Amino acid sequence: MDHGELFFHFELQNYEIRFKISKFVIVISKPIPMAKKYRFNEDWASVFVGLIIVVAIIVATIIPDIPKILPKFGPKEGWTGWTVLSTEVFTSGNSVRVLMTFLYFFFFAIVGSWLMGRKGKELLPAFPIVFILSMISQFIASAGLMKDLGLETVLFSLVIGLFVSNVIGTPKWLKEGIQSEFYIKIGLVMLGATILFSEIMKAGLFGVLQAVIIVLSVWYFAFWIAKKLKVDSELAAMLASAVSICGVSAAIATAGAIKGDSKKLSYVISLVLIVAIPMMIVMPLLSRWMGLTPEVTGAWIGGTIDTTGAVVAGGTIAGDIALKFSTIIKFSQNVLLGIAAFIISIYWTYRKSDNDPAEKPSLKLIWQRFPKFVLGFIATSIIFSFFINPETAVAAGKTIKSYQSLWFNLAFVCIGLETRFKDLVTLDRGRPAYAFLIAQAFNIILTLIVAYVLFGILWE
């Protein structure tokens, strides 16, 4: 084998995949259709693909000679002008990275399609278009202004998909290649790499205590108020998780756990990202006006604002100490994501059984309905928390987060392509939006009280 060459070979009966990277060249052998008895459902296929990608990234982290393929979109603070674009983004080397990234993701999308018993040819015209749209959304989100506003790429992915769907129209051949739920589940399996036990230790007793109190209290209140406003249970669960846990990721994980409607998911995420913008600006100003300590300010911001980018932006405005505490509290809530997804999955299985008395909630039924990608999420988290060198875990985790984000971007482009904007605006006559805003107001007040008691009175 040549130096710097990667070669992957998977074999099952009547099925073969060959994958080779050498000098930026990928070769995929022609597949033989998988025998029916070897087909996976979407959950297991996402676990398989997600874990293979995670293992590949760990290997690439340990072996430095393996080339990095993800494209660059400017410095961490975002691109601000043509000078940065011409020297860091619009370069021949970056063009090769974009091509390599496309081939890498296309390969795994096809692998997933084959594992589920499909031919994979439906992806050939559709996936390149979806990928290009996701790259455009990534480029826009990487602008300095968008970074300052804390706007995440998934918002632009959704908006671009909605634009194509509602202005141009999504052709049938493109719809046939849309796999939004599969891409989301792959991303969720990989998300486990960023949920580490060590983060709980960093937060300490008070950080974990605040996270548990807020998540439990706000989730219950948000679900209750949504039901009072006659929002359906599926949408209410997504709203409650988004408000109480960690915004976008929590909404996505909950949608996967309850097999929720992707249109409702996109609605919730739009609310989360839009509401986070004024909060990250107003909350630091309110903290100064009320004379809160930096510790209380950080705990309040981290426990209330629903997106990590907006938390960092709000914490930065409030000062270095507030930024540190807001980040720690946010990580504490993020850690609870896997536990929450597991509990919601079990609850939803029993709830379905209650609606259908003929089906008793046996262990077999629970297993059949349980979203298997949650197991992949938990497995990845355990591997990175306990079985990998901490330095390797941190380095690989950063790369995995970038790959996971791109899977989410692809998913939300797909969701936008199959959604009519009118359906989002008129969803339940605005009742979910009212429920979200009321729940967020409750979250702001309760978190302020808890943060003040823990970090203003008890904290030394």
Regions found by a protein language model. Give the residues of each.
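Structural signature of multi-pass alpha-helical membrane transport proteins
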Residues: 35-39, 44-90, 105-118, 123-178, ...
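Alpha-helical membrane segments and immediately flanking helix-loop junctions
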Residues: 43, 231-279, 295-319, 403, ...
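Entry/N-cap segments of selected transmembrane alpha helices
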Residues: 94-98, 126-131, 135, 182-223, ...
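Helix-coil boundary and interhelical linker segments in multi-pass alpha-helical membrane proteins
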Residues: 197-206, 287-295, 316-328, 452-460
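Oxyanion-binding "anion nests"
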Residues: 319-356
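Structural signature of hydrophobic alpha-helical transmembrane segments
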Residues: 91-104, 147-160, 203-216, 241, ...
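Small-residue-rich segments of transmembrane alpha-helices in multi-pass membrane proteins
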Residues: 51-54, 127-139, 159, 182-195, ...
